[in-house]
Amino acid sequence: MDTHRPIRRALLSVSDKTGIVEFARALEAQGVDILSTGGTCKLLADNGIKVTEVSDHTGHPEIMDGRVKTLHPKIHGGILARRGQDESVMAENNISAIDIVVVNLYPFANTVAQENCSLEDAIENIDIGGPTMVRAAAKNHKDVTIVVNASDYDRVISEMQSNKGSTTYKTRFDLAIAAYEHTAQYDGMIANYFGKMVPDYTEEAAEDTKFPRTINMQFTKKQDMRYGENSHQDAAFYVENDIVEASVATATQLQGKALSFNNIADTDAALECVKEFDVPACVIVKHANPCGVSIGSNILEAYERAFKTDPTSAFGGIIAFNQELDAATAEAIVERQFVEVIIAPSVSDAAAKIVSAKQNVRLLVCGQWTDKAAGQDIKRVNGGILVQDRDLGMVTQGDLKVVSKRQPTEQELKDLLFCWKVAKFVKSNAIVYARDGMTIGVGAGQMSRVYSAKIAGIKAADENLEVKGSVMASDAFFPFRDGIDAAAAAGITAVIQPGGSMRDAEVIAAADEAGMAMVLTGMRHFRH
């Protein structure tokens, strides 16, 4: 059975007019009659393309300030007509077949993103006729081609040129899927917008909320994976549509094997941690926890110091930088250790050549970043999801409250703030020991905080790193003084923690007894 369908009549009505003139001209060259509306029609006519206004085709003018343009049986009958079945009905009602529909929708997302957007502005940017035509054409994809993305224009024209003005069923089916994805995303945006507000012209006594009644999100599959977190689990990686922040989702892979499920999770942890620093920094992650973090005068120094924290755990780890990967640093990495992933804002040609000697190493370029974008984190639980704001909180020196008898030194303050940034990305209960802008011990994921403190000390001792004179960060308050006592016994001289425990006085007294300085942040950084 022939599944090719010739295109003889097109309907073009787009908000984003990128490439539409060239596309229409190519259709015209194939002998296609073109229908259009409003601004699209004027643009095509101004560029010398023969076009028929939809209102002339239907015999009915646009009404209600353009709210009703294409909602007419001559349009939807022409789109939905089943070839070989509905011809008599079409003839009886003077309906002509429409073979291709090219539509993209009113820019609702851009409108509501504007600070001064009113409810009325939002309402007027809800497209009605567009989604209706898109869904109709997608439903009848057996006979009709639907195009919602300008990136598909060339594909359609190329196929028509290769198939005597026709498109194949495979292409129409693929474009229909894209159309349904497009309208689903569009309706989801509208539902999200209205779901978190109460119109100011109602008498309903309720407040706006940042969390809508339902959540509608759309992600696009980037890759299928060999398996998930474990080999018996199937997996795929989906990326958020329209994301602009530098991330593992937007990164470009220059070389190496395909990223695994765990690679992606660990790379995300490493990159988000290194973003906290505005001086050359390196973060090495293993199983989603930083095992070595350092700042330096350059990224080579930062890497060497980060590696020094825990060389054993760094084996097979993920390395993230906040500056360009240069040749000297690349050389140090490939000569010193086995690494799964290296990610940086950019990679020099010389560095890329050096890393290419290790073909299995996954080398990623994520681009430079400025500020982290506000947004929400989602955690899956059985039967639901937990939604919260991204943890973008961070303190500066001016936010700290000194509660100990001894004031921290200037160097201790620098190290405390460094240590606090690292602790934010360590699984709770998190304890981090650091000195001179370098971690010397990380205690992660323990059920009791005192054991995390002990593990941080053990890690430092195992690598012959001097704890005496170092500082400690805790992601949450100390419920008892035992964590402070363990740190003091190891040689810690200053502590940064949120405070807020019922036993804060006891904990502060323990610090004073040991001659330690203690500062409170008033901010917790649990990470589960």
From Swiss-Prot:
Pfam families to which the protein is assigned, alphabetical: AICARFT_IMPCHas (PF01808), MGS (PF02142)
CDD domains given in the database record: IMPCH
Assigned keywords, A-Z: Hydrolase, Multifunctional enzyme, Purine biosynthesis, Transferase
KW Transferase (keyword) present: yes
Reaction catalysed by this enzyme: (6R)-10-formyltetrahydrofolate + 5-amino-1-(5-phospho-beta-D-ribosyl)imidazole-4-carboxamide = 5-formamido-1-(5-phospho-D-ribosyl)imidazole-4-carboxamide + (6S)-5,6,7,8-tetrahydrofolate; IMP + H2O = 5-formamido-1-(5-phospho-D-ribosyl)imidazole-4-carboxamide
Pathway assignment: Purine metabolism; IMP biosynthesis via de novo pathway; 5-formamido-1-(5-phospho-D-ribosyl)imidazole-4-carboxamide from 5-amino-1-(5-phospho-D-ribosyl)imidazole-4-carboxamide (10-formyl THF route): step 1/1; Purine metabolism; IMP biosynthesis via de novo pathway; IMP from 5-formamido-1-(5-phospho-D-ribosyl)imidazole-4-carboxamide: step 1/1
A GO cellular-component term linked to this record: cytosol
SMART domains listed in its UniProt record: AICARFT_IMPCHas, MGS
GO biological process, one term: 'de novo' IMP biosynthetic process
Domain comment, as recorded: The IMP cyclohydrolase activity resides in the N-terminal region.
Protein name: Bifunctional purine biosynthesis protein PurH
Annotated source species: Pseudoalteromonas translucida (strain TAC 125)
